[in-house]
Amino acid sequence: MEQEQDTPWTQSTEHINIQKRGNGQRTQRLEHPNSIRLMDHCLRIMSRVGMHRQIVYWKQWLSLKSPTQGSLKTRVLKRWKLFSKQEWIN
């Protein structure tokens, strides 16, 4: 079996911790120094995807033509505009 070669990318993004055990053996542990940042980035992307799904859902709902939904449609549109402004500011 071949071992993976370290590329400049893996060398720069992974941090190697070498520890000594009680019996003198050395152990290597790979850690990502920016793992918290990476998780945060993934969560942001996932929330954007969720927001996009909400937008698609509301657009589909608002496209339904029904006289009883006329007033609801304007209220939802106003609320949605306020909500989306706040989301982008945050």
Curated annotation (Swiss-Prot):
It is found in: Host mitochondrion inner membrane; Host nucleus; Host cytoplasm, Host cytosol. It comes from the Viruses. HAMAP family: INFV_PB1F2. Residues 1-31 are annotated as: Disordered. It holds the Pfam family PB1-F2. This is Protein PB1-F2. Plays an important role in promoting lung pathology in both primary viral infection and secondary bacterial infection. Promotes alteration of mitochondrial morphology, dissipation of mitochondrial membrane potential, and cell death. Alternatively, inhibits the production of interferon in the infected cell at the level of host mitochondrial antiviral signaling MAVS. Its level of expression differs greatly depending on which cell type is infected, in a manner that is independent of the levels of expression of other viral proteins. Monocytic cells are more affected than epithelial cells. The keyword Membrane applies. The record marks 66 as: High pathogenicity.
